Amino acid sequence: MPVKWVLHWQPNQGSTVSSQILNEATQCVESINGVKEGRWKATLNYYKPMLKDQANQLEFPRDFLGISLADQPNKYYFIIRTQRIVLEADSSIQLIMEKLQSYKSKVALYFDGFQYQLGDFRLRVGKVVPTHSENVRGIVMEVEYLPISSMEKAQKVMEEFLEIWNEALAKRSLPGKFVNIDLNFGEFGLGDIYTPQHTAVRYALVMAHMIATVQAVRG
């Protein structure tokens, strides 16, 4: 699987995230000859246990994240952050969980945007919105380098692309920037060769960071 970075929009102090940022970002991709390939969607759910007996609470993870990825439509990924565990399951697991009612989705976030091809790169740019809401909570951008699946070998190329991207975006004088978070995948038992589990971990930690950043800016 190609190496992928998941960037998130970090607003400047005192500014907010809006659909206008997404519009500017997609226009910027097209201005550097990105070819639009279609829509892009993904979902993230934040689960909490439905405990009938509080005495059992120590036996269950306090919370975990479930993620569906656009490029893995038949799979569903779980991340238990406190225990540094990432699991891959069949997408039907969501229906099973609904019937069992052992965990309930407390927060659901949708990623909605567009996919582009740009040379050896595939880009996905989209807004993050809660269920049944149009309030934009964030902007996320996937950068995928198609020829390489080794994170170490792709590092330099990805950094160079990010420089070019930030230069192009800087011309638009937007109140913030896209940032990449360096992660220690070894903590989750993941190696150098990129897998969908790497992407799931990226999303889990990017979302936690993005929510904290937005709250700090508002504060």
Swiss-Prot record:
Q: Offer one Pfam family short name for this entry.
A: Med20
Record has Nucleus as a keyword: yes
Report the record's Gene Ontology biological process terms: miRNA processing; positive regulation of transcription by RNA polymerase II; regulation of defense response to fungus; regulation of salicylic acid mediated signaling pathway
- Protein location: Nucleus
Per the record, its GO cellular-component terms are: mediator complex
Q: Which UniProt keywords apply?
A: Nucleus, Transcription, Transcription regulation
Transcription is among the record's keywords: yes
GO molecular function terms attached to this record: transcription coregulator activity
So what does this one do? Component of the Mediator complex, a coactivator involved in the regulated transcription of nearly all RNA polymerase II-dependent genes. Mediator functions as a bridge to convey information from gene-specific regulatory proteins to the basal RNA polymerase II transcription machinery. The Mediator complex, having a compact conformation in its free form, is recruited to promoters by direct interactions with regulatory proteins and serves for the assembly of a functional preinitiation complex with RNA polymerase II and the general transcription factors.
Note the subunit structure.
Component of the Mediator complex.
Return the protein name.
Mediator of RNA polymerase II transcription subunit 20a
Organism encoding this protein: Arabidopsis thaliana (Mouse-ear cress)
Quick one: which gene encodes this? Answer: MED20A
